[in-house]
Amino acid sequence: MSDILSINDLELNGAKVFIRCDFNVPMDEFLNITDDRRIRSAIPTIRYCLDNGCSVVLASHLGRPKNGYEEKFSLQGVAKRLSRLLDREVIFAEDVIGNDAKTKAEALKAGEILMIENLRFEKGETKNDEALAKELSEFGEFYINDAFGVCHRAHSSVEAITKFYDEKHKAAGFLLQKEINFAQNLIKHPSRPFVAVVGGSKVSGKLQALHNLLPRVDKLIIGGGMAFTFLKSLGENIGNSLLEEELIEDARQILQKGKELGVKIYLPVDVVAAQTFSAESAVKYVPAQEIPNGWMGLDIGPASIRLFKEVIADAQTIWWNGPMGVFEMDKFSKGSIKMSHAIIDTHATTVVGGGDTADVVERAGDADEMTFISTGGGASLELIEGKELPGIKPLRKEE
C-alpha cells in the first residue's frame, strides 16, 4: 500500500483543496436520501483538510444524467445532508464550472466548504475530457481522490485531472486508502477457508472476476439471476428464468475450472418462482433444475439458504458481491436477507462489495456486523480481477 501517495504526506497548510468524493447515494421518489453511508465515509478526509486550515471544494457525480441539468440528479440534497452531519455550512454552487461555481470558489475562505453541482451535468466528465479536467483543477492547489467507487472509470475528475498536479500536490484520501488496502490484502492474504458469494443478475459483469477468484478461493457460491446460466450449462430446465445464452459455454468452463482446481462450486437447489415479476403474482417453491415452462426463478428458496449456510459455516473470509434474488421486491428479497444474516452469524472476516449488496445488508439490519462494506462495486470487482484502475494508477509513487 505504501506505493500510493497519501494525504498524510501533503503539505496542506491553509491551501485550497479539491476533493473528488463519491456521493452517488440512493434516493427515494421524493429525492430523500435513503442511505447516507457514502457521505459519512467522506468525512474523515474533509475534516482532516479543515483541521489543516484549508478551504475545501467537493465534487461528485450522482446517477447518470443524460443531457445536462436534471433536478433529480442535483447534489443540493447531498450538500444539505453533509452540512447536517458536519454541523457546519456547506456552500452549494448551482453549476460545475460556470460563473456560480467559480465566483463562490474564489471567495472561499479557510475553513469553508463548497460543493459544486453534479459533475456529470458536464458532458466532458464521462469522456475524460482534458479541457474540463483543467478547469476543475483550478478549484484547488491540491487534488485528493476519495472516491473508490469511480476509480475504475477514466473520467475527467478521476483520471485526466491528475495530469495537472505533480506528486507533491495529489494523493488518495483516507477512504480510498482504506478501500485499496483492504481489497489488496483480501486477495493476497485471505484467512482460509475463503468463500466467495457471487450474485446479481448477469454473468457478463462478473465473468472476469470469477476467473480470477477461482484460483484464490476454497469455495464459490453462485446465486441471483446469473445462477440460471450456470444451471442451463448443466442441462437443467430453467423455465423462463433469466438466461445469457451466449455465456452458457463460459459458465461451463468456470464449473470445469473449479473441478480442476478443487474448488467446490455451489448453485441454488431450489428457487422462488413466479410467472410474472409483480407484487400480485402467485409464487411457489420449485427445485432449481425443474422450473416449469412459463415460470421464472426470482429468488433462492429455503433449501438453497440451508445449503449455503452450511457451506459458509467454517469460513474465515467471506467476500459477497451481488444479491441472491430480485431483492427490490419484498417477496423476492428473503433469500438475500437470509444470506446476509447467515454471513454475519459466521466468525469470518466479511467483506461486502457493491451498491446493491450494501443495500441488502442495510435493509437486513446487518451493516454494523459486517467487517467491511466497500463503497465501490465495479471498482472492487476490477481490483479482484487484478486490473490497474485508472483512478489509482496516477496516485502511485513514481519509482
Swiss-Prot record:
Keyword field: ATP-binding, Cytoplasm, Glycolysis, Kinase, Nucleotide-binding, Transferase
Enzyme Commission designation: 2.7.2.3
InterPro entries for this protein: Phosphoglycerate_kinase (IPR001576), Phosphoglycerate_kinase_CS (IPR015911), Phosphoglycerate_kinase_N (IPR015824), Phosphoglycerate_kinase_sf (IPR036043)
Binding site for substrate: D22, F23, N24, R38, H61, L62, G63, R64, R120, R153
Subcellular location: Cytoplasm
Top-level taxon: Bacteria
Molecular function via GO: ADP binding; ATP binding; phosphoglycerate kinase activity
Pathway where this protein functions: Carbohydrate degradation; glycolysis; pyruvate from D-glyceraldehyde 3-phosphate: step 2/5
Record-level GO BP terms: gluconeogenesis; glycolytic process
Reaction(s) the record says it catalyses: (2R)-3-phosphoglycerate + ATP = (2R)-3-phospho-glyceroyl phosphate + ADP
GO cellular component labels: cytosol
Primary enzyme class: transferase
Annotated residues for binding of ATP: K206, G297, E328, G354, G355, D356, T357
HAMAP family hit by this protein: Phosphoglyc_kinase
Family stated for the protein in its record: Belongs to the phosphoglycerate kinase family.
PANTHER family: PHOSPHOGLYCERATE KINASE, PHOSPHOGLYCERATE KINASE 1, CHLOROPLASTIC-RELATED
Subunit and interaction comment: Monomer.
Name of the protein in its database record: Phosphoglycerate kinase
